[in-house]
Curated annotation (Swiss-Prot):
Protein's gene: psbZ
Keywords: Chloroplast, Membrane, Photosynthesis, Photosystem II, Plastid, Reaction center, Thylakoid, Transmembrane, Transmembrane helix
GO biological process: photosynthesis; photosystem II stabilization
Taxonomic path: Eukaryota, Viridiplantae, Streptophyta, Embryophyta, Tracheophyta
Ranges in coiled-coil conformation: none
Entry similarity comment: Belongs to the PsbZ family.
Pfam family, one: Ycf9
InterPro entries, sorted: PSII_PsbZ (IPR002644), PSII_PsbZ_sf (IPR036512)
CC annotations in GO: chloroplast thylakoid membrane; photosystem II reaction center
Name of the protein: Photosystem II reaction center protein Z
Residue stretches spanning the membrane: 8-28, 41-61
Subunit-level organization: PSII is composed of 1 copy each of membrane proteins PsbA, PsbB, PsbC, PsbD, PsbE, PsbF, PsbH, PsbI, PsbJ, PsbK, PsbL, PsbM, PsbT, PsbY, PsbZ, Psb30/Ycf12, at least 3 peripheral proteins of the oxygen-evolving complex and a large number of cofactors. It forms dimeric complexes.
Membrane topology listed for this record: Multi-pass membrane protein
Cross-referenced HAMAP family: PSII_PsbZ
Amino acid sequence: MTTAFQFALFALIATSFLLVVGVPVAFASPGGWSDNKNIVFSGASLWIGLVFLVGIPNSFIS
């Protein structure tokens, strides 16, 4: 259980870093929002899912 929690936490941190770097790059690219909105929404959905995936087990582990 602890290993799965640590992996989910690492995935959350990695996804957060990718979104912090990737979203401004997506907005600054020539196509802008219209070409990259699916990628941004997919990343945001993954991030929200990981927040719940980390938050729920954290209440049992801590």
